[in-house]
C-alpha cells in the first residue's frame, strides 16, 4: 500500500478573486509575517546564518531583514542568540552579510509568493493557520522532492530525505513542505502524476495538510502553552485511548466497507476496468473492447444503485472517473496506508511506542485525506478519527485561540463579490489555470 500525492478533491484557488476572504487574509498575513521561506530551485527569499562556535544554524527571510516592522524583532533574535553580548556593530555586520547573500540570489516573484501562500493556507482549517501566525512558526516551501535542500547539514543528515517534517518537537516548531516540482508549470504529458504542474500543487497541499495536522494535534492551554497531544503523550510513547481505539475501529471499518462494495459488484467492475485500461494503453479497439465497456456500464450502474440504497453517498463522487472502480480501490488502499503507515521511520521495537507513532500519524492525516479525497469520503472511511479531528481537535484550537486573543472566532466562508466580467474571465488578470490530474 502506498500513499497518493497527485489527486485533490478541489482545485486550490491561486488568485485573490477566487479565494474565501478569510483564507486570502491569512495568506497575506503569512507573507507579511516574514516567516514564509521559499526555494524554487532558481529563486530563493531567505539566507542561511551559521555560527559554529555557538552551534547556531538558522534561516532568515528577506522580509525579516528589510521590512521596517520586522527588523526590531530580527535584531532581538540575534541579540538573544548571543545572550545580549553582541555589539551593535556585530548585529549590523550580520544583517549586512545576510543581505549580501540574498542579493546574490534570484528573488521570488511577488505573484509566485502569493500563489504559493494561497495554496498553503487552503491546506488546513483557518484556525490552524491563525495559530501558525500567532506562534510565529516558520514555513518552508521547496520545489525539490525532499526538504534537504533547505536545511543545514546537521538537520539534513537527520531528516533531509523526508518530503515534509513532523512539526511537533515542542520548542522549535517549523513546517517543511516539498512540492516535487513547479506547481505553476505545465503538466508533464508523459508522466502527469508527478513532477511539474498540478502534481506539484497537489503534493504541496497534501504534505502541508499532514504537517499542519501534526501542528494542530498539539494541545494548548488558555495561555497558549503546549501541554500535550490529542493523539498521544508529548514524548510520543503512549497513544491516548480515544485515538488508539478510533484508529483500530477505522482500520476494521475501512476493510469491511471495501469488502461490501466488492461483493456488491465492484470486484467484477475492477476486473473489466483493468482489462480496459490495458487495452486503452495499447490502443486496442474492436468488439471485445465495446463488450467490456458495456459490462462496466452494467456493474457501474449496479454499484451506484447499491451505494444509494445503503446511503454511501461518497461513492457517487467517483462516478465521473474514467476508471471508477480502480479509483475507488486506489482510494481505499491510500486510506489503509495512512491508517497504518509502514515506513521504517514509524517502526519501533517497543509495540506501545510503535502504536503511539501510528496514532500520531493517523490523526494528522485526517486533514490530508480530506484535502485529497473530500470530506464525504474521509468521513465515511476514517469515520472515528474524522470525528475526533473536526469535533475535538479543531474546537479545542478555537477555544484556546479565543482565550489567548480575547476574540470570538467564527469561520467565515464569504468570497469577494464578483461582477459579470470576472465571472466569464474577460478583462481578468488570470494568466494561469491549474489543470487537475485525476488518473492512476
Curated annotation (Swiss-Prot):
InterPro entries, alphabetized: Uncharacterised_RC0048 (IPR020183)
Domain of life from the UniProt record: Bacteria
Protein name: Uncharacterized protein RC0048
Species: Rickettsia conorii (strain ATCC VR-613 / Malish 7)
Amino acid at each position: 500500500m502506498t500513499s497518493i500525492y497527485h489527486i485533490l478533491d478541489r482545485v486550490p484557488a491561486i488568485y485573490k478573486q477566487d479565494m474565501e476572504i478569510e483564507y486570502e487574509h491569512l495568506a497575506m498575513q503569512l507573507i507579511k509575517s516574514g516567516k514564509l521561506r521559499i526555494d524554487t530551485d532558481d529563486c530563493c527569499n531567505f539566507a542561511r546564518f551559521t555560527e559554529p562556535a555557538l552551534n547556531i544554524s538558522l534561516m532568515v527571510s528577506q522580509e525579516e531583514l528589510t521590512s521596517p516592522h520586522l527588523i526590531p524583532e530580527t535584531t532581538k533574535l540575534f541579540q538573544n542568540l548571543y545572550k545580549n553580548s553582541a555589539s551593535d556593530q556585530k548585529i549590523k555586520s550580520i544583517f549586512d552579510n545576510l543581505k549580501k547573500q540574498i542579493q546574490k540570489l534570484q528573488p521570488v516573484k511577488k505573484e509566485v509568493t502569493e500563489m504559493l501562500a494561497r495554496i498553503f493556507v487552503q491546506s488546513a482549517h483557518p484556525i490552524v493557520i491563525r495559530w501558525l501566525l500567532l506562534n510565529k512558526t516558520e514555513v518552508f516551501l521547496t520545489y525539490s522532492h525532499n526538504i534537504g535542500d533547505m536545511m543545514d547539514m546537521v538537520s539534513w543528515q537527520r531528516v533531509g530525505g523526508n518530503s515534509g517534517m513532523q512539526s511537533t518537537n515542542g520548542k522549535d516548531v517549523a513546517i517543511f513542505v516539498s512540492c516535487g516540482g513547479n506547481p505553476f508549470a505545465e503538466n508533464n504529458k508523459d508522466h502527469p502524476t508527478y513532477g511539474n504542474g498540478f502534481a506539484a500543487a497537489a503534493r504541496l497541499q497534501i504534505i502541508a495538510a499532514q504537517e499542519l495536522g501534526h501542528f494542530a494535534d498539539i494541545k494548548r492551554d488558555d495561555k497558549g502553552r503546549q501541554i500535550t497531544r490529542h493523539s498521544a503523550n508529548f514524548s510520543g510513547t503512549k497513544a491516548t485511548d480515544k485515538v488508539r481505539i478510533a484508529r483500530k475501529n477505522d482500520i476494521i471499518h475501512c476493510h469491511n466497507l471495501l469488502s461490501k462494495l466488492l461483493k456488491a459488484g465492484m470486484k467484477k467492475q475492477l476486473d473489466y476496468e483493468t482489462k480496459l485500461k490495458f487495452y486503452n494503453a495499447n490502443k486496442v479497439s474492436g468488439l471485445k473492447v465495446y463488450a467490456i465497456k458495456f459490462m462496466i456500464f452494467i456493474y457501474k450502474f449496479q454499484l451506484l444503485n447499491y451505494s444509494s440504497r445503503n446511503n454511501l453517498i461518497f461513492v457517487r463522487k467517483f462516478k465521473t472517473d474514467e476508471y471508477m472502480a480502480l479509483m475507488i480501490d486506489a482510494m481505499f488502499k491510500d486510506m489503509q496506508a495512512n491508517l497504518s503507515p509502514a515506513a521504517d521511520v514509524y517502526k519501533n521495537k517497543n509495540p506501545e511506542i510503535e502504536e503511539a507513532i501510528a496514532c500520531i500519524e493517523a490523526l494528522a492525516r485526517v486533514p490530508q485525506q480530506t484535502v485529497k479525497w473530500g470530506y464525504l469520503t474521509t468521513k465515511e472511511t476514517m469515520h472515528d478519527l474524522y470525528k475526533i479531528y473536526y469535533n475535538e481537535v479543531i474546537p479545542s484550537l478555537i477555544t484556546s485561540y479565543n482565550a489567548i486573543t480575547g476574540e470570538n472566532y467564527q469561520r467565515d466562508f464569504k468570497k469577494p463579490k464578483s461582477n459579470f466580467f470576472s465571472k466569464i474571465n474577460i478583462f481578468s488578470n488570470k494568466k494561469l489555470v491549474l489543470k487537475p490530474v485525476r488518473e492512476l
